[in-house]
C-alpha cells in the first residue's frame, strides 16, 4: 500500500476547476475553469506554489482544458466558446497569439504531438480536428487544419497523442475510443478500428511511457487497460493489413462508486491515478508478478481529495509521485505519493 500526503491547497479560481497541466520542465503549471481564466503557477522563494499570472482575455466561456507543447514555449486552451487559444511568451509575458476557429460547438480537449508540429482538438460537435503548425523566423506562427475526422457519433471528450509517434487517440460519449494515423502514401489521416469495451461515456485516456498501452476511464465506473499488438505477435492475434491492433487486457471494476472523469499514467513510476465523481482520487499500481497480456493492478491509495467531483489528475513530468488534482470545489491540490512497502 501507499499514501498520498497533501502538500498544498491552492485557491483563486471562481467556480469549478476543470483542468491543470504541468509545464514539461516541471517548474510551472497552468489551471483553468468555469471562470474563463487561466492561472499560471510557480514556486515562490518560500517553496510554496503561487499564481504568477492570470490570463483573462482569451475566452468568453468556460475553459475546459489546457495543454503545453513539448518544447514548453506554447500553451493551448480549449473552451466552450468553440475556440482554441494558443499562448506564448515571445514578448516576455503570456499573450494569445492565435485563436483557432472551426468547431461548431464546445471544444472539450486539446493536445500537442510529441514533435510539436501538430495540435489536435475535439468537440461536442462530434469531430476531431488536426492542425499543423508552421513556424517561420520573425513571423507569426500559422495554424492550418489538415484533417477533420468524423469517426465518433457523439460528443468527443478527450484527445491524446501517443508519447513516441504521431498516433492520436480520442474518447467519446459514444462509449468508444478511436485511433488515427497518417497514411504516409497520401498524407491523409485514417481512422483505425474503434476500441470497444466500455458500456458508457469514455471520459479520458492516457498512454503509458512506452505508448504500448492505453488506460481509459468511463461513466460506467470502470478503468480499462488496452495493449497494442503488432504483426507476428506471440499470442497469434491477427493484425489486418500487417498493422497493429489494440485489445482490452484488463478491467478494473468495483473500485469507483461514480463516474471516473480522468486518468493519468505516471511516466516515471507506472502508477495510475484516477479522478472520480465521488470526490475521491485513487492510485493503482501494477502487481509485481503481473502478466503483460493479462495485467493485474492493485489499489494502493484511496483518498477523499475534494469536497465535490474530482475532475483532473496530473502526475509531475519529472518528480516521481508528485500529483496535481483539481475539482468542482474550486480547489487545486498538490500531493506526494509515498510507497509504504
Curated annotation (Swiss-Prot):
A single Gene Ontology CC term: cytosolic [4Fe-4S] assembly targeting complex
- Similarity-based family: Belongs to the WD repeat CIA1 family.
Q: What is this protein called?
A: Probable cytosolic iron-sulfur protein assembly protein Ciao1
User: What is the role of this chain?
Assistant: Essential component of the cytosolic iron-sulfur (Fe/S) protein assembly machinery. Required for the maturation of extramitochondrial Fe/S proteins.
Q: Which InterPro entries does the entry mention?
A: CIAO1/Cia1 (IPR028608), G-protein_beta_WD-40_rep (IPR020472), WD40/YVTN_repeat-like_dom_sf (IPR015943), WD40_repeat_CS (IPR019775), WD40_repeat_dom_sf (IPR036322), WD40_rpt (IPR001680)
List the source organism: Anopheles gambiae
Checking PROSITE patterns in the record gives: WD_REPEATS_1 (PS00678), WD_REPEATS_2 (PS50082), WD_REPEATS_REGION (PS50294)
Q: Which Pfam families match?
A: WD40
Q: Which GO terms describe its biological process?
A: iron-sulfur cluster assembly; protein maturation
Q: Does the keyword Cell membrane apply?
A: no
Instruction: Identify the Gene3D superfamilies for this entry.
Output: YVTN repeat-like/Quinoprotein amine dehydrogenase (2.130.10.10)
The gene that this protein is the product of is: Ciao1
Source organism phylogeny: Eukaryota, Metazoa, Ecdysozoa, Arthropoda, Hexapoda
Keyword Transcription, does the record have it? Answer: no
Amino acid at each position: 500500500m501507499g499514501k498520498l500526503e497533501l502538500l498544498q491547497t491552492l485557491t483563486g479560481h471562481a467556480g469549478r476547476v476543470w483542468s491543470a497541466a504541468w509545464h514539461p520542465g516541471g517548474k510551472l503549471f497552468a489551471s483553468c475553469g468555469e471562470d474563463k481564466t487561466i492561472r499560471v503557477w510557480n514556486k515562490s522563494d518560500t517553496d510554496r506554489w503561487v499564481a504568477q499570472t492570470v490570463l483573462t482575455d482569451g475566452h468568453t466561456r468556460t475553459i475546459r482544458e489546457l495543454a503545453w507543447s513539448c518544447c514548453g514555449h506554447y500553451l493551448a486552451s480549449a473552451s466552450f466558446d468553440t475556440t482554441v487559444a494558443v499562448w506564448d511568451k515571445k514578448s516576455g509575458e503570456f499573450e494569445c497569439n492565435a485563436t483557432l476557429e472551426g468547431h461548431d460547438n464546445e471544444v472539450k480537449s486539446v493536445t500537442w504531438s510529441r514533435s510539436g508540429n501538430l495540435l489536435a482538438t475535439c468537440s461536442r460537435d462530434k469531430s476531431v480536428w488536426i492542425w499543423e503548425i508552421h513556424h517561420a523566423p520573425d513571423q507569426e506562427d500559422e495554424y492550418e487544419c489538415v484533417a477533420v475526422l468524423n469517426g465518433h457519433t457523439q460528443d468527443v471528450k478527450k484527445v491524446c497523442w501517443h508519447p513516441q509517434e504521431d498516433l492520436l487517440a480520442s474518447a467519446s460519449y459514444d462509449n468508444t475510443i478511436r485511433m488515427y494515423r497518417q497514411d504516409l502514401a497520401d498524407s491523409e489521416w485514417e481512422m483505425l478500428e474503434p476500441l470497444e469495451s466500455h458500456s458508457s461515456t469514455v471520459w479520458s485516456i492516457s498512454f503509458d511511457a512506452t505508448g504500448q498501452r492505453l488506460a481509459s476511464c468511463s461513466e460506467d465506473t470502470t478503468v480499462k487497460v488496452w495493449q497494442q499488438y503488432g504483426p507476428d505477435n506471440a499470442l497469434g492475434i491477427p493484425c489486418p493489413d500487417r498493422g497493429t491492433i489494440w485489445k482490452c487486457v484488463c478491467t478494473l471494476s468495483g473500485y469507483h462508486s461514480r463516474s471516473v472523469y480522468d486518468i493519468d499514467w505516471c511516466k516515471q513510476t507506472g502508477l495510475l491515478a484516477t479522478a472520480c465523481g465521488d470526490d475521491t482520487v485513487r492510485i493503482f499500481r501494477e502487481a509485481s508478478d503481473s502478466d503483460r497480456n493479462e495485467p493485474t493492478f492493485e489499489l494502493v491509495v484511496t483518498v477523499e481529495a475534494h469536497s465535490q467531483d474530482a475532475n483532473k489528475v496530473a502526475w509531475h513530468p519529472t518528480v516521481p509521485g508528485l500529483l496535481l488534482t483539481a475539482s468542482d470545489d474550486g480547489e487545486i491540490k498538490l500531493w506526494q505519493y509515498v510507497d509504504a512497502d
